[in-house]
């Protein structure tokens, strides 16, 4: 889980420059956004559906070809990692994965906190975290799938926030009709 999350944060993060801290590399805004990215990474059939929607909207054949490649390589059967439907959509506790990344100073967790609750959780990818992503695909080429898939998910997501991405995912009937606490079916 940790390496998948690291690649998501790298692909979906925006460059971050902090003159007082040269160790920061990127910022990924929003935990709901992270869960939405993770859902598409773990559910290739839903990602393929979104790719086809984008193809229909833009006419860009690259998106259709990417969707076809997902099915031709049997990804929905081979790469699917189920997620449960929670209050605001697909959810998985990421504490263990994030703890591992945090303990190696690859990711730092911050955000906007109110008096009563956290308004937004943001993830700072350190320069070291960015380097791990770059080096990992060289040292272990099999990890290139995670880098490429996270980049594709980031491209499809664009600048949309977690709420907008979750709304888009809820447009899928099987997703929306999943019982609260149930596993979202393929």
Where are these regions (language model features)?
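Short, amphipathic alpha-helical interface elements at domain boundaries
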Residues: 1-76
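Intrinsic disorder/low-complexity detector
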Residues: 8-11, 134-139, 174-186
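Alpha-helical scaffold segments in carbohydrate-active enzymes
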Residues: 36-43, 100-103, 128
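Intrinsically disordered or highly flexible coil/loop and linker segments, enriched in small
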Residues: 46-47, 107, 162
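Structured domain cores in non-transmembrane regions
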Residues: 51, 66-96, 105
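A short, conserved structural fragment
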Residues: 98-113
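Minor-groove-contacting beta-hairpin "wing" of winged helix-turn-helix DNA-binding domains
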Residues: 114-125
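Short, amphipathic alpha-helical interaction segments positioned at domain boundaries
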Residues: 123-176
